[in-house]
């Protein structure tokens, strides 16, 4: 199958930088977002009505959650869409599997391919793409997805979304531990720069200590570009999966609860690195 025409639904922070990469790779891209006017300079052909999404080889979703993906899919099915559907959103894997059963009956290929890396890596096409679904179907869209990053097969449908949630849980646990350690070190009288040099040369280093502490926390800029409410959503999904499937679950509920409480305290649309402000007050 030769893929030429690609629909992209959801052109927010991530979608708006991912879709232009597909254009640059030579595909015809048709974009739809109820909140955004697409710049003509992007090369994306804006679609104003979901009913116009016809005769496309692939349709990609980059939406807030799986429930919205399911609703949009229902609208597409009313138009007898036969495109390959790819959910690159951070959806609940259980919703993904449920939608997959519905689409399988209609003989529509459906994959989940959530991403990790944030806006900065999305801009340069270096996302980690976690692909779930039938391997033959993933092979069909491998070249297309590779335009946006490295494609890693995760497993059956829903596996990509499961790993995405679990990855963000592990990242969040490291974030809270790193913030707690930094605040404690400063209270003890240790300079932040000394703390970072030693932690990042020792076994405690992680993504937060290497990438976030100096640039966003110690600098007090708190502008990483990843909203706390998105982290809360992903960690909540992971916590729910862990409760359902794990024999022992000593940490996930505490991480999820702490992030949710921090979101309540921080107000409107905080960056996820602002959790440090909450933790600092209680250290």
Residue ranges and their predicted role:
Residues 102, 128-160, 172-207, 245-247:
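Internal alpha-helical scaffold of NAD(P)-dependent oxidoreductase catalytic cores
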Residues 1-51, 152:
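NAD(P)+-binding Rossmann beta1-loop-alpha1 motif at the extreme N-terminus of oxidoreductases
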Residues 63, 90-169:
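Rossmann-fold dinucleotide-binding core
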Residues 9, 13, 17-21, 113, ...:
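N-terminal glycine-rich phosphate-binding loop for ADP-containing cofactors
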Residues 50-108:
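Rossmann-fold NAD(P) dinucleotide-binding segment
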């Amino acid at each position: 199958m030769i893929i030429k025409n690609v629909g992209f639904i959801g052109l927010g922070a991530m979608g708006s930088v991912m879709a232009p990469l597909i254009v640059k790779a030579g595909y015809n891209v048709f974009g739809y977002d109820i909140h955004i006017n697409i710049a003509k300079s992007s090369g994306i052909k804006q679609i104003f009505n979901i009913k116009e999404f016809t005769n496309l080889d692939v349709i990609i979703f980059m939406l807030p959650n799986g429930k919205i993906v399911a609703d949009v899919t229902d609208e597409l099915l009313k138009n007898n869409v036969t495109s390959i559907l790819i959910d690159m959103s951070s959806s609940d894997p259980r919703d993904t599997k449920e939608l997959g059963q519905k689409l399988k009956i209609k003989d529509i290929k459906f994959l989940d391919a959530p991403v990790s890396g944030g806006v900065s890596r999305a801009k340069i096409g270096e996302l980690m793409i976690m692909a779930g679904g039938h391997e033959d179907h993933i092979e069909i869209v491998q070249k297309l997805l590779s335009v946006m990053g490295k494609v890693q097969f995760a497993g059956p449908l829903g596996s990509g979304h499961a790993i995405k949630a679990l990855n963000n849980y592990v990242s969040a646990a490291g974030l809270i531990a790193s913030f707690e350690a930094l605040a404690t070190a400063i209270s003890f009288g240790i300079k932040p720069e000394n703390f970072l040099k030693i932690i990042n040369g020792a076994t405690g280093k992680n993504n937060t200590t290497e990438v976030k502490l100096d640039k966003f926390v110690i600098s007090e800029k708190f502008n990483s570009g990843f909203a706390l409410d998105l982290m809360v959503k992903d960690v909540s999904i992971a916590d729910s999966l862990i409760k359902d499937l794990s024999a022992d679950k000593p940490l996930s509920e505490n991480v999820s609860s702490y992030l949710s409480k921090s979101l309540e305290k921080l107000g409107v649309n905080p960056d996820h690195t602002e959790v440090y402000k909450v933790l600092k007050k209680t250290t």
